[in-house]
Amino acid sequence: MLLKQASVVALGGALGALARWRLSSFNTPEMLPLGTLTANLIGCLALGVLMSFLRPGSLLFLFAAAGVCGGLTTYSTFILELVSAKSLAASSVYAVTSLLGGLLCMVAGLRLGRLFGA
């Protein structure tokens, strides 16, 4: 990977990770991990929109999609929160909400991107 490409991914990833860290402050032990859920849903929606506007492989795509969206979303934290949930019911609700919500947000993002520009 070229240094320029790696640099834009790293910069975008840092920004996405900072946003995820800030959103994680909304997680509470009593509720679903709303911060992580929000980060993952926003990332899916944004990636869907970006897929309609940006050419894959371009520096802007690498920055926004691989970097920001990649740093914002988190599969490992999602799985950790699933196995750490206090009940099977809470874990199930979180899993279904995350997966179905992510799919719906991605589809919505793709449609919004096509509707408004690409």
Predicted segments with their positions:
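Membrane-interface helix-loop junctions in multi-pass transporters/channels
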Residues: 1-118
